[in-house]
């Protein structure tokens, strides 16, 4: 008997039969399948929609994460992308859409406005979608880069595989062009030029 982990849930290989067979927990297998079959419903309200369209383009290839085809009926979706600012008038519609989604359902806040209200600090704007519906992953940025959104999608997939429902925030990647080591290397190269 041995432990096998081949990109999916933890399985046990049972020996004793001629060909052997593998067993796993049913919930681990279902979570592994769910994380690669996310049916998204985009709720796009503001300027982050442009980055959403860029992220959905072939350059960033959401298809490799199993979330490429948007559903435009909440009853067929299990991942709600909240993209942009939510006003007080839009909040009841957002809540209704969330309630119509199939269980289990996940929510990804796309951008600073969806995460915390952004720079709109007035009575007409909801200060973060978690005031209206529960949120699983927050992707900060104004607008967030497509790479950060894909990091958020991968973080959500990890949470689904673990069965974790606690909120998570995507941490920004360190840009090599802005690190001090990179700047020191550039300065040395400039000094060595004639």
UniProtKB/Swiss-Prot annotation:
Keywords: 4Fe-4S, Cell inner membrane, Cell membrane, Iron, Iron-sulfur, Membrane, Metal-binding, NAD, Quinone, Translocase, Transport, Ubiquinone
Membrane topology annotation: Peripheral membrane protein
InterPro entries in the cross-refs: NADH_UbQ_OxRdtase-like_20kDa (IPR006137), NADH_UQ_OxRdtase_20Kd_su (IPR006138)
Positions bound to [4Fe-4S] cluster: 47-48, 113, 142
Catalytic reaction annotation: a quinone + NADH + 5 H(+)(in) = a quinol + NAD(+) + 4 H(+)(out)
Highest rank taxon of the organism: Bacteria
Names of the cofactor(s): [4Fe-4S] cluster
EC number: 7.1.1.-
GO biological process, one term: electron transport coupled proton transport
GO function term, MF aspect, one: NADH:ubiquinone reductase (non-electrogenic) activity
Places the protein is found: Cell inner membrane
Protein name, per record: NADH-quinone oxidoreductase subunit B 1
């Amino acid at each position: 008997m041995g432990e096998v982990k081949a990109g999916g849930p933890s399985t046990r290989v049972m020996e004793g039969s001629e060909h052997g067979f593998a067993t796993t927990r049913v919930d681990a297998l279902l979570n592994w399948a769910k994380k690669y079959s996310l049916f998204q419903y985009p709720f796009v309200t503001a300027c982050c929609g442009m980055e959403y369209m860029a992220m959905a383009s072939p350059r960033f290839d959401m298809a490799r994460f199993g979330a490429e085809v948007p559903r435009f009926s909440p009853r067929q979706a299990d991942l709600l992308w909240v993209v942009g600012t939510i006003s007080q008038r839009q909040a009841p519609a957002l809540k209704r859409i969330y309630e119509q989604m199939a269980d289990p359902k996940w929510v990804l806040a796309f951008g600073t406005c969806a995460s915390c209200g952004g720079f709109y600090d007035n009575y007409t704007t909801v200060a973060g979608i978690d005031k209206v519906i529960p949120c699983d992953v927050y992707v900060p940025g104004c607008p967030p880069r497509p790479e950060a959104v894909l990091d958020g999608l991968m973080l959500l997939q990890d949470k689904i595989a673990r069965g974790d429902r606690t909120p998570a925030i995507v941490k920004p990647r360190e840009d090599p062009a802005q690190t001090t080591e990179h700047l020191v290397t550039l300065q040395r190269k400039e000094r060595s030029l004639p």
